[in-house]
Amino acid sequence: MVRFKVLTTVIIENGVKLKLNLIDTPGYGDLINNEHCWEPIVKYIKDQYSIYLRKELTAVRERHIPDTRVHVVLFFINPSGHSLRPIDIQMLKKLGDIANVIPIIAKADTLTMEEREAFKHRVRNELQENSIRVYPFDHEDYDDEERELNSQVQAMLPFAVVGSTKVYDVDGMPVRGRQSRCGMINIEDPSHCEFVQFRNFLLRTNLHDLIDTTTYTYYESFRSKQLLALKESSAKPVSYTHLRAHET
C-alpha cells in the first residue's frame, strides 16, 4: 500500500534560501497485485491542485497562498539494465498528464558504462513508443537557445545518478560518495554519474520553469476543467418531476 511521507527542508543556493517539500511514496509497486497502484499518487497530486484552487476562489483570498502543489515528480527507475516494467509505463503515462516528470536511473553505479548507455537508450525508446510525456519538453514560446538546451537534456534522459549521505577523506579532500569493490564512487564527479548535471538542471537552470509549467500548464488545465464542471452543474435545469415530487 502506498504511503506518503512529507519532509520539508531548506537549502541555500548562492545565498538564496529555498524551501523544499519532498514527498516520498514508499510502498509503490510492492504488492503482489499492483493493479491501479498509481491511483493514490495521482489522487494526491490532484488533491493539492484542489486545495490551491479552493484557496484561490475564497472571497477573502490570502495574499500568499501556501503552495503544496507538486512541481516535479522524480521517477526513480530500477537499474535492471533491461527495460521499464509494465507498471512503470502505466504510472508514467498517468503522471505525465498531470505533472512534470523527470525519469532517473537509481543506483547507476550497479551498471557498467556500456550497460548504462544501452539502458538509457532503451528507456528513451520506450517512453517514445508509449507516448509518455517527460520534462523537459519544447514550448512554442521557447527561443532557439532554450530549444537547444532542452535537446541536450532530452538526449541525456534518464539521468543516471548515485546517491550518498557519507563523506570520505580522499587525499585530504572531502568526497561525498560510495565505496565499492572498484574503488570510490564520487557522486559529484561527472565521469562517475550524472548527479551534478541533474542537480544543476533541477535547482539552477530549470527551477523557475518547473514552477511556471506546473502553474500555467498542468494546474491551469485542472483549474479550467473544475470551473467548467462547476459552471455546468450550477446551470443544470431542475427536473420538473423532481419538483412535483417535493410538492406532493
Q: Residue ranges of each PLM-predicted region?
A:
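Conserved small/polar residues in nucleotide/adenosyl-binding loops
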Residues: 241-248
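Switch- and interface-adjacent substructures of P-loop NTPase systems
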Residues: 1-99, 112-134, 138-141, 145, ...
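Short hydrophobic alpha-helical runs that function as membrane-insertion/retention elements
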Residues: 100-105
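C-terminal regions of RecA-like/P-loop NTPase motor modules
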Residues: 232-240
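Conserved P-loop NTPase
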Residues: 157-186, 194-197
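Short beta-alpha junction loops
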Residues: 107-109
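Intrinsically disordered, low-complexity sequence elements enriched in Ser/Thr/Gly/Pro
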Residues: 17, 67, 176-179, 242
